[in-house]
Amino acid sequence: MAPSHAAHDSAATAHRIDGRAIARSLDERTAAAVRAIVARDGAPPGLAVVLVGNDPASEVYVGRKIEACRRVGILSFEHRLPAQTTQDALLTLIARLNADPTIHGILVQVPLPSHIDDGMVLSAIDPAKDVDGFHPVNVGRLSTGTGGLVPCTPLGVMMLLDSVIDDMKGMDAVVIGKSNIVGKPIAMLLLEREATVTVTHIETRGLPDIVRKADIIVAAAGAPRLVKGYWVKEGAVIIDVGITRLPGEGGKTRLVGDVAFDEVQHARAVTPVPGGVGPMTIACLLANTVKAAEMRG
C-alpha cells in the first residue's frame, strides 16, 4: 500500500511557479532584442513554420506560434503543405529556407505524416536556423556544453527553476522521462549547472524511492498524476512538463500533468498544469529565433 503524506502540515502550500508571468517577462526582453535587430539590420528576424497535413493539435500549436511571433515583432512565414506531400518535396522546401537570408529560424511541426522520416527532415535544417534545437549538431553542442540552440521546453524548464533556485550546484535532481526532446536535454542542462542528476522513466525500479531523495524533480514521462505526494520530500522544487487531456465533468475535458498537484503542497515550489511549462516553450522558441539572428550577426 502506498504510504500517506498526511504527516505533512496540511496547511502548507507550495509556491506556484507562474509560467505565464515568467514567459511574459521573457517576451518583453525578446521584443526589445527584436527592436535592436531592426535598428541594426533594417528588418526583424524571420521564422518559417512548416506544417504538413491538418492534424488538429498541430494546427493549434502552429497558430499559437504565429500569434506569439506577431506579439514580439518577429516576421512569421507559414508553409502549409498537404498530408500527401513527399519527403523529397519537403526537403526541397527546407533547402530553400536554409538559403533564404530573410529566414533566421526554421520550425517543422512534428509529428510528420508516417511516410516522412522525421529525423531525416529535422537533420536537413541548417543547425544555425534550428530553433527547436533538434539537429544532431545542436544536440552535440548541448552535450558538450559548447553553445548552440537549446530545445525550447528544456530551456524553459531551466528558466522556471532559476526563478526559485539561486544555485543548483550539488543539488540532487531527478528527471522522470528519457525523451530526446525533453528528458535527455534537461538532464544535460542540469549537469551543466553542477546538479547531481539521475535520469529515470516509468519502467525504473523503485522510482518513488529515487524521487523521494530529490531536491529538484522534473516530471516529463507523459503519465498523468504519476508523481504522488508520498514521492516528494518536503522542500523539493517540482517542474511538471507532462500534459494529458482527460475526460472531465459534463463531457468536457481537463488538462492534467504528470504530478498529483493537490498532493505535493508540502513541496517548496511546483508548476501548475496548465500555466507552467507550456507558456515557456513558445516564449523560448521566440528567444531562440532572436538568438539565431544575433548569432548570424
Swiss-Prot record:
Pathway: One-carbon metabolism; tetrahydrofolate interconversion. This is Bifunctional protein FolD 2. Gene3D superfamilies: Leucine Dehydrogenase, chain A, domain 1, NAD(P)-binding Rossmann-like Domain. One of its GO terms (biological process) is tetrahydrofolate interconversion. It holds the Pfam family THF_DHG_CYH. Belongs to the tetrahydrofolate dehydrogenase/cyclohydrolase family. NADP(+) binds at residues 177-179, 202, 243. The lineage of its organism: Bacteria, Pseudomonadati, Pseudomonadota, Alphaproteobacteria, Sphingomonadales. Its EC number is 1.5.1.5, 3.5.4.9. It catalyses: (6R)-5,10-methylene-5,6,7,8-tetrahydrofolate + NADP(+) = (6R)-5,10-methenyltetrahydrofolate + NADPH; (6R)-5,10-methenyltetrahydrofolate + H2O = (6R)-10-formyltetrahydrofolate + H(+). Keywords: Amino-acid biosynthesis, Histidine biosynthesis, Hydrolase, Methionine biosynthesis, Multifunctional enzyme, NADP, One-carbon metabolism, Oxidoreductase, Purine biosynthesis. CDD domains: NAD_bind_m-THF_DH_Cyclohyd (cd01080). Homodimer.
